[in-house]
Amino acid sequence: MSRDVRAEKLAISLLILSLFLIFQLVAEIYLNNGDQYHTETSPFTRGRSHVTRVPNHDASLSIPFLDKINQFWHVGGATQIRNIQSIKLTQDRDQDKHGLVLSNGIGDNTINDFEIVFTFRISHDPTTQLTGDGMCFAITPENGFLTQNLQSSYAKKQYMMNSQGVIADNTDLMGFPKNLPGLFIVLDTYRNQGHDHKEVPFMDVFINVAPESDWYDINSDGELSTSLRLNSRGHIKLKKNALWNRVTKLRIIYLESISFLKIDVQYAKEGNYWIELFQTTENLYLPKNMHTGQRYIGCSALNGQLTETVELLDVSTSEFHWNDMDASIEDTYDYAKEAELFLEQEFGEVLDREPDEFTKWKMIKAQPNIKTGSQSAEQKTSNNPHSRLFKVVLTIWHYSEILLLIMGIYLFSACIRVFQRRFKKIRSRRKRAGSHSVGLLPM
């Protein structure tokens, strides 16, 4: 009887395992049925992503500065370039001045999936309690306000018409025009609204796709801006003691292919690791120049009555491309899945866009200048417990087949051990039965 019970349990275990594996197979076939862009992402077949990092030297800045500046960058305001030291955008005790650098588009500024790392330093007289005003990091489709002769009122009006209203001689956006289109990250070092100066420095992330009607409001520290502020829950706080008079890095990661934006900071005082400040996977499109398809990279700083020294030390730009493939593939679902795999392997971020979500994103990109309204593309930061839970669940799902394989191997080995024992018992019984039957025949 015990042999029958054991055999029944074994049969049930094998049946359950078989049904589960069949269910997994049918589910995959069903979910991917009709998907012409399906890319196999099984843990058994996926290795390193085909997407790799490619340095973009045209959109980068490093010592010595002058050669690169003369070739690929515009300089504005009171910027001072020290060839083997730094680019001083503003100088302490130099009131009501601004400085900026912005890529000129002569080099390669057609960037879609990319990482930009700005290295900078903000310093001031240690005896001074208050400093200002701050700095800005921009990715914009517009750089004509630095190149055109806008001395006459007619030239200014003509430029405003051609640029959808950009106010060329305004510097409210920490040195940039207040209605500059594109993505801009404001690092504010002085609180204009209210008297609580303990909150500085802080950061805000804005996007402007309608410069004729939207702008950044410096007097309210961005609070009354009509440009869309992505961090709608309040200012993003920065560490004052780690920022002042120290080398700091700000990293922008943007993958247009899967609509992913992430902003990190690295304080030299605290170590060689990144701290996430902002992240969103909402359908967020950074506008490109309508004529060239380029995005220009810039950095600026502004002094008011209060002053500080802002130095730009390095700009490092890398693009992400599929190895040895035409750029047209970067608009396909195949590439999107490879980009997700690259994002997971390179930055530890897990995304899983479905085909219908990808199709919706392509439709949004086809109409990039439609305003997203007041609804925020709110960040899904690492501080959000739901985001962490989602990543854990998604990671477990990605590797569920490996877990099933391990379970299958275990059950298979258990089956082998059971059969070996049964076989030994059967052999021993046969031997005993054979030994009892041997003897003399009756007379």
Swiss-Prot record:
The UniProt entry's GO CC annotations, sorted and at most eight, read:
COPII-coated ER to Golgi transport vesicle; endoplasmic reticulum membrane; endoplasmic reticulum-Golgi intermediate compartment; fungal-type vacuole; Golgi membrane; nuclear envelope; nuclear membrane
Membrane-spanning segments: 399-420
Query: Looking at the keywords, is Chaperone present?
Result: no
GO biological process terms, alphabetically, are: endoplasmic reticulum to Golgi vesicle-mediated transport
- Sorted alphabetically, which InterPro entries does this protein's record hold? ConA-like_dom_sf (IPR013320), Intracellular_Lectin-GPT (IPR051136), Lectin_leg (IPR005052)
Q: Which Pfam family, any one, appears in the UniProt record?
A: Lectin_leg-like
* Location(s), subcellular: Nucleus membrane
Classify the main location.
nucleus
Q: How does it sit in the membrane?
A: Single-pass type I membrane protein
> Which regions of this chain are Perinuclear space-facing, per the record's topological domains?
28-398
Superkingdom per UniProt: Eukaryota
Record topology, Cytoplasmic segments: 421-443
Give the molecular function GO annotations: D-mannose binding
Q: What else is known?
A: Present with 319 molecules/cell in log phase SD medium.
Q: What is this protein called?
A: Protein UIP5
